[in-house]
Amino acid sequence: MKKVLILGVNGFIGHHLSKRILETTDWEVFGMDMQTDRLGELANHERMHFFEGDITINKEWVEYHVKKCDVILPLVAIATPATYVKQPLRVFELDFEANLPIVRSAVKYGKHLVFPSTSEVYGMCADEQFDPENSMLSYGPINKPRWIYACSKQLMDRVIWGYGMEGLNFTLFRPFNWIGPGLDSIYTPKEGSSRVVTQFLGHIVRGENISLVDGGAQKRAFTDIDDGIGALMKIIENKDGVASGKIYNIGNPTNNFSVRELAHKMLTLANEFPEYSETAKKVQLVETSSGAYYGNGYQDVQNRVPKIENTMQELGWAPQASMDDALRKIFEAYRGHVGEARKLVEQS
C-alpha cells in the first residue's frame, strides 16, 4: 500500500488527485492545506490523513511526513498571472523558496518526488509543439515580472534535475491548462483574480462583459482535469520505474483554441443550461490591452501546445475529453452555485 504525501491537498490538482486515489486504489493519502472547502467529505475518509497547516510554518510536520511516505507531491504554488505581475517576490518566495526544503527532504529520505513543473517554463518558445527534451525555454526582459513564475519553476526543475544526477528519484510533470470544477472560485468578481475559464464562467453567471486581452488571439491547449489526473496516477504508480528521472508534458494538443474561441464556446454552451442562458445573453466580448488588464509587467505567449508522445508511450496514457466535454462538465458542476455567485452583482 503506497503512502502518498500531497502538500496543497485542497488545491485544484490536489483534491481531484485525492478523490481518484481514494476511489480507485488502496493507497493512503497524507495531506496538508490551509482549508478543506474543495475536499469536503474527502477530508474525513478513512485513508485520508488531513492536517490543517502551512508549508512555510509547519516544517517539522512536513519533514516527518516526507520521511513517512513513499511518494511526495509538493503542489503548493501561486499560479495566477495577475499575481506574477503585481507581487513577484511573493510568487518566488512560495513557489521556489518554500518548496526547496521539501525537495531536499525527499533527497534526504530517498523518496520519489513528483514535482509540478508548468507549461509556463517554455515561455515564448517558437516551436509548434513544446518538447520536454529539446525545446528552448525563452523569456522576456527583467522589467516584465510576469516571468517570475516560469523562472521560479524552471529553476526548481534544474535543481531537481541536479539532485537526480546525485541519485534522487524524481518525475517532473508539466500541466498544460488543466481545467475542471474547482479550478478557481466563480465568486470572485475582480478581473484577473482567477484563471481564464473560471473568470469567463463568473462573468457569464453575473451577466458581465468578457474582456479579451489583446483581442484574445493567444491560443492554449486545454486539458480536462480527469485526463490530467489519469497521467498523474500512472506517474505515482511508477510501474517498473518507468517515470523515474523523466519530464512529462500532460496536455491535450487537439484542444488548442484561442481565448476568443474559448469565450464563444462558453457562451454557446451556456445556452444549454437554464441556469446560465438568461445572463449569458447580456454578455458582450470587449477588447482590452494586456497593460490595462494585468499591468505593464505582463507579456503573453501566443501559442502553447504540448508534445506528449513520450507521456503517451511510456505511461500508456492518452487524453480523452474534447473541449466541449471538458467545458460542459464545468457548467454542470457549478449549476447549484449560480444564485450565490449572482449576489456579488446585487451587493456591489
Where are these regions (language model features)?
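Active-site "gating" loop of Rossmann-like NAD(P)-dependent oxidoreductase/epimerase domains
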Residues: 78-90, 97, 108, 116-149, ...
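Active-site Tyr-X1-5-Lys
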Residues: 143-171, 201-206
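C-terminal substrate-binding subdomain of Rossmann-fold SDR/epimerase-dehydratase oxidoreductases
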Residues: 204-348
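NAD(P)H-binding glycine-rich loop region in Rossmannoid oxidoreductase-like domains
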Residues: 55-94
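N-terminal Rossmann NAD(P)H-binding glycine-rich loop of SDR-like oxidoreductase domains
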Residues: 4-24
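Rossmann-fold cofactor-recognition segment
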Residues: 46-57
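Conserved glycine-rich Rossmann-like NAD(P)H-binding loop of the short-chain dehydrogenase/reductase
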Residues: 26-36
